[in-house]
Amino acid sequence: MSIPQIRTEAIEAVGRKILMEYDPSLLSGQPCPVPIETIIETKFDLILEFHTLRKNPKILGETIFDDGAVVLYDQIQRQYRMIAVRAGTILIDERLCDPSKLGRLRFTCAHELAHWVLHKKLYSGTGDVAAYNGNVSSDESHGIIERQADTLASTLLMPLPQIKKCFYRLRIGRTDEQLIVEMANIFEVSKQAMQIRLKSRNLI
């Protein structure tokens, strides 16, 4: 099975459809943080769990596509352990629950949901990209699917109609940096995520 080549505008359309079905006001009302955790658990009926995924926080999230088991790090015992997991579980590293990492937490949740929406048929087993079975190299497949997941995550957390509405309301008298900070606070995303979103739409 090959990786689908999905145009950016097609991914934007997927994101709009998800938000429209959940709550149309997220696209047309007062700009606000998208309740991504609630969308994951109620609209998609997925299980959201928080654990220490690895000793070093290099992997912040994993999406489980089949019933099975995963290896997680136990900070108390200081060793890895195996736990049973069900298909439709999203695992998030609990160290992201620090209030200072709110933007990173929300983006990671959206990113993992994006894998479920876009890549469910591409995965087998309970791993992350390593479990992918395809006809391209693992490095190439990893890059493609991660970019696609990032794009959908951005679309979900920073809907384009709302981003444009905010941008044109706030831009007068503000530097790009000030604009990025204010808009990141409104949507509860990181400054980096907001900067990338605005640049990708040629707004800054």
Model-identified regions with their sequence ranges:
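Active-site hotspot residues in diverse enzymes, especially metal/ion-binding acidic/histidine motifs
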Residues: M1-I204
